[in-house]
């Protein structure tokens, strides 16, 4: 026999479960999937990770579909240089990118002969390996691996193509309330070096 109360109770349960799931994903933690090789060797294609949503406070991008429920960012905590951060790319304010934070507001970032400079100071690095291979798209390429250390002591491994030309760039001056991000797979990453597609990332675009 058709039980109307049973359907109502199940609908309520599903509704409450949906509200709880949205709350957890918006306020506490959210799963993300790594779709590209731009963060290799530290994050691999297909890796799944959970991202803290409260680390840097909250903006509209903390919530599904980025609803304009308030402006700016609340409970803001400044991210640290070297943090791996998920953000909405400024090009469309929809696509999630995950990169390493290199430049803080006011910093000057530059590449000279594939060596990273922050505020005119070369970033210390040790060569970790001459014989690594890494993916760029669906191709496997030979790379040099380096252990880089940022001014605040944050360390990570970064890789550069062996047969790539030296990277030389203009100086990127990070605007107020913005950040500069790089992929660890330096020759296979679309990041803040590409001003038309990513560029500087405003603090309101940080997800976690």
For each feature predicted by the language model, list its residue ranges.
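Soluble "head" domains of membrane/secretory-pathway proteins
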Residues: 2-8, 23, 27, 32, ...
């Amino acid at each position: 026999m058709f039980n109307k109360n049973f359907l109502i109770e199940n609908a309520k349960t599903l509704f409450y479960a949906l509200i709880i799931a949205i709350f957890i994903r918006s306020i506490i933690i959210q799963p993300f999937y790594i779709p590209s090789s731009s963060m290799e060797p530290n994050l691999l294609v297909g890796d799944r990770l959970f991202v803290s949503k409260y680390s840097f406070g909250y903006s509209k991008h903390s919530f599904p579909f980025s609803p304009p429920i308030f402006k700016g960012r609340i409970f803001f905590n400044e991210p640290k240089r070297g943090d791996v951060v998920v953000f909405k790319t400024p090009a469309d304010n929809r696509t999630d990118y995950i990169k390493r934070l290199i430049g803080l507001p006011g910093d000057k970032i530059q590449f000279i002969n594939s060596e990273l400079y922050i505020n005119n100071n070369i970033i210390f690095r040790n060569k970790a390996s001459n014989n690594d291979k890494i993916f760029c798209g669906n191709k496997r390429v030979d790379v040099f691996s380096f252990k880089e250390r940022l001014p605040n002591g944050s360390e990570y491994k970064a890789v550069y193509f062996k047969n790539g030309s030296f990277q030389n760039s203009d100086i990127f001056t990070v605007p107020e309330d913005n950040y500069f991000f790089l992929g660890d797979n330096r020759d296979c990453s679309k990041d803040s070096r590409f001003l038309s597609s990513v560029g500087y990332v405003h603090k309101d675009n940080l997800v976690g």
